[in-house]
UniProtKB/Swiss-Prot annotation:
Residues that, per the record, bind adenosylcob(III)alamin: V155, E176
GO cellular component: a single term: ethanolamine ammonia-lyase complex
UniProt-recorded name of the protein: Ethanolamine ammonia-lyase small subunit
Keywords: Bacterial microcompartment, Cobalamin, Cobalt, Lyase
InterPro entries membership: EutC (IPR009246), EutC_C (IPR042251), EutC_N (IPR042255)
Molecular function GO terms recorded: cobalamin binding; ethanolamine ammonia-lyase activity
Any Gene Ontology biological process: ethanolamine catabolic process
Length: 242
């Protein structure tokens, strides 16, 4: 460690400040050619957290408490969801009919939550961010759609739901592929008139939503700010200047 600091002319206090800003492994040092024991054990523990985030399930009580309509993609289980990403983007015709018949049609903003690759992220962040988004949207006079929870969801599920309900802006709050220190990281993908006929570049993203990244409450405020711009400009993704 001392050799690294000398080589790169880094002061100890500067390194401490950098480490305080990120959970990433910075200047962890080595014991000979191997990682130090504490570093190796922390790596194994963080890897286990990431694995748990992928294979865990979203708390059903949380979804029920927030009154989300619950649906599932064509993926039968978690293993198929992981090995067949295409099935996580599709719904059966029965499910699409169920969505259309049980949700508000033509909303200004349609909110979706999906487990994605980290159910842990949804469990940790959904409650706070959802209330912030809904409260601020309604205070601005937007017609907010029936919230929908999608089990075994990929981002593209937002396109099918948007088309079915004819939503102006659709957002999906989804658990992201976990890193070694960010098992609770969630992202919000947003699009104006989201459609399966449009490219992925139609989407605007707010990512890294978790306590050590962008806190849920702050992320919720930023999401609504972006939605305001989308509604005004009638576009999203790479076409939108935010």
């Amino acid at each position: 460690m001392e050799n690294l600091l000398k080589i790169y002319d880094i002061k100890e206090e500067e390194l401490s400040e950098l480490k305080a800003l990120t959970p990433a492994r910075i200047c962890v040092g080595r014991a000979g050619t191997r990682l130090k024991t504490n570093t190796f054990l922390k790596f194994r523990a963080d890897h286990a957290v990431a694995m748990d985030a992928v294979w865990s399930s979203v708390d059903e009580k949380l979804i029920d408490t927030l009154n989300f309509l619950k649906v599932q993609t064509l993926a039968k289980d978690k293993e198929e969801y992981i090995t067949r990403p295409d099935l996580g983007r599709k719904f059966s015709e029965e499910t699409l009919d169920y969505i259309k018949n049980n949700c508000i049609n033509e909303p200004d903003v349609q909110i979706i939550a999906g487990d994605g690759l980290s159910a842990t992220a949804i469990n940790a962040n959904l409650r706070k961010i959802y209330f912030v988004i809904v409260e601020k949207l309604k205070s601005r006079g937007y017609k907010v759609g029936t919230p929908i929870f999608v089990k075994y969801a990929r981002v593209a599920t937002m396109d099918k739901i948007s088309e079915e309900l004819n939503a102006k802006v659709t957002i999906i709050l989804i658990g992201e592929r976990p890193g070694l220190a960010t098992g609770e990281s969630m992202s919000s993908y947003m699009a104006y008139e989201s459609s399966t006929k449009k490219p992925e570049s139609q989407r605007t993203v707010v990512s890294n939503i978790h306590n050590k990244g962008i806190p849920s409450v702050d992320a919720g405020k930023e999401i609504v700010r972006i939605i305001d711009i989308m509604m005004k400009e009638k576009k999203s993704g790479v076409e939108l200047r935010i």
